[in-house]
């Protein structure tokens, strides 16, 4: 392992495996999740083309700690993978989607000793609901900020 430096990786993305497994089971919002080669997942939103596969360190938050150690880094700030923010979903489904994604992200980093920190995501179709989710993520979950897409459907 490299000597630990006082560095923080401030730009990382991930999608918790348990979130994708839950969506695969429930088909939340009509989203399809299929197994991909190598243990990953392919997500398809209703009416959209399948996304590129999510696999490896994108899904495995324990692997991230090993990667940080190998880089001599102290912490990593993770935002949900932009491809799965769920902006394609109608407002009600989108709010459930981001709430479950934010909760799963916090569960995934809980055992990291605060070496992994998280940004929330928000569904932007209903600004008041997005503001409530941001407040919940900051005050109840302890997320450090939020990451939103720059290109919205429609």
Q: What are the residue ranges of the model-derived segments?
A:
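Helix-coil boundary/capping segments in enzymes
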Residues: 1-154
């Amino acid at each position: 392992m490299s000597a630990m430096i006082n560095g923080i990786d401030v730009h990382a993305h991930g999608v918790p495996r348990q979130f994708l497994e839950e969506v695969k089971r429930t088909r939340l919002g009509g989203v399809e999740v299929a197994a991909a080669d190598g243990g990953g997942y392919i997500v398809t939103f209703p009416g959209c083309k399948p996304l590129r596969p999510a696999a490896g360190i994108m899904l495995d938050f324990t692997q991230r700690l090993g990667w940080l150690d190998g880089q001599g880094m102290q912490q990593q700030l993770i935002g949900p993978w932009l491809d799965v923010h769920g902006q394609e979903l109608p407002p009600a489904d989108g709010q459930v989607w981001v709430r479950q994604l934010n909760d799963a992200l916090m569960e995934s980093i809980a055992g990291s000793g605060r070496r992994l920190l998280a940004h929330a995501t928000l569904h932007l179709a209903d600004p008041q609901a997005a503001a409530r989710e941001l407040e919940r993520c900051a005050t109840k979950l302890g997320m450090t900020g939020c990451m939103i897409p720059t290109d919205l459907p429609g």
